[in-house]
């Protein structure tokens, strides 16, 4: 018996592959992190089979390389994601995102009275991990929120 293994999303020659994104989160990452703000080709795989997650999303961006800081910000939404840098169709660097200390300009503060919602300032949160949970503290209103509360509003 032979197995024909085919890529479900076309390989890229050079660029970034964000893999192991939880299903239904891929589009949110594209929007929040402004990954579509490029003229380069972007390929998206949604609800792909995954041995580890059951189902996953996948994003491939040609000729763009995410920085370590950008990759780490993805950990807020996709803690198990991997960010692979591709050159000549080969993985030349693999980043495993870790929670950053701060995240700026991506999330929206859930506090409706926070100035970041009405003034022309970039949102800014400090990120804390406590008892296995992630908490985000807004720089402006100084309120602390569980990760899910912030992610729902963003």
Curated annotation (Swiss-Prot):
What's a single GO MF annotation on this record? metal ion binding
Q: Where does Zn(2+) bind?
A: 109, 114, 138, 141
What keywords sit in the KW lines?
Answer: Metal-binding, Pyrimidine biosynthesis, Zinc
- The stretch of residues making up the signal peptide is none
Q: Which cofactor does it need?
A: Zn(2+)
Which domain of life does the UniProt lineage start with? Bacteria
Any one of the GO CC terms: aspartate carbamoyltransferase complex
User: Function of this protein?
Assistant: Involved in allosteric regulation of aspartate carbamoyltransferase.
Q: Kindly state the subunit structure of this protein.
A: Contains catalytic and regulatory chains.
| HAMAP family the record matches | Asp_carb_tr_reg
Stored NCBIfam families: ATCase_reg
- UniProt-recorded name of the protein: Aspartate carbamoyltransferase regulatory chain
The gene for this chain is: pyrI
